[in-house]
A protein has these predicted regions:
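Single conserved hydrophobic/aromatic residue that forms the stacking wall/gate
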Residues: 1-12
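Nucleotide-activated donor-binding/catalytic signature segment of Leloir-type glycosyltransferases, i.e.
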Residues: 41-57
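A short, well-ordered alpha-helix in the C-terminal region of glycosyltransferases
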Residues: 147-159
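A conserved nucleotide-sugar
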Residues: 16-33
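C-terminal alpha-helical cap of glycosyltransferases
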Residues: 161-175
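Glycine-rich phosphate-binding loops of nucleotide-dependent enzymes
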Residues: 33-40, 69
Length: 175
């Protein structure tokens, strides 16, 4: 089982279709919140029989997934705490990205990387979020054991417990 979290688009649909044709055993899960534009996702994805949609159940979806593609800030931390290997995608309109990139001073965009102060998960931004890159990164996740990533997730989890969340809040404030 595999999780695509948050916003779905034609790129996701193409990717799910690709894996249906090339590896029919793979099942995708789309984890959404009730606040998401439910009708958009259901309409776009309805003919994909290798995709299930779940609402407001991110933790269980991530726990059941072998790996994930995450497009939500808090879901990246949830996936790390569930020790679910992932890569992160962020794509927004150009103006929003331009403004945010000038306001936020961080080398990373995902919470696991920010809190670890190093790259532990791959981040794809803006134009990097395309079909070829998603297939490439997902193939890497599927074909590696991801031990180092899981070890980094364990270390992050321990550091959040041991630092009594002070590190979490200080890093977030510095952004």
């Amino acid at each position: 089982t595999h999780c695509i979290s948050s916003a779905a688009s034609d790129v996701y649909k193409r990717q799910v279709s690709h894996y249906k044709n090339h590896n029919p055993k793979i099942k995708f899960i789309l984890a959404l919140t009730k606040n998401s534009r439910k009708y958009c996702f259901e309409e776009k994805m309805k003919e994909l029989d290798n995709l299930s949609i779940f609402y407001d159940d991110t933790k269980n979806v991530l726990s059941a997934s072998d790996f994930s593609i995450i497009a939500s800030g808090t879901a990246t931390l949830e996936a790390a705490l569930c020790k679910t290997p992932m890569f992160v995608i962020y794509k927004t309109n150009f103006l929003s990205y331009f403004i945010l990139s000038r306001l936020i001073y961080s080398k990373f965009i995902s919470l696991p990387n920010i809190l670890s102060e190093k790259k532990i998960v791959k981040e794809l931004l803006q134009s990097q979020v395309n079909f070829n890159n998603l297939v490439y990164e997902l193939d890497i996740l599927m074909n590696e054991d991801n031990k180092e990533m899981k070890l980094n997730f364990e270390n992050l989890h321990r550091s959040l417990i041991n630092d009594n969340q002070s590190k979490f809040f200080s890093v977030i404030e510095s952004i």
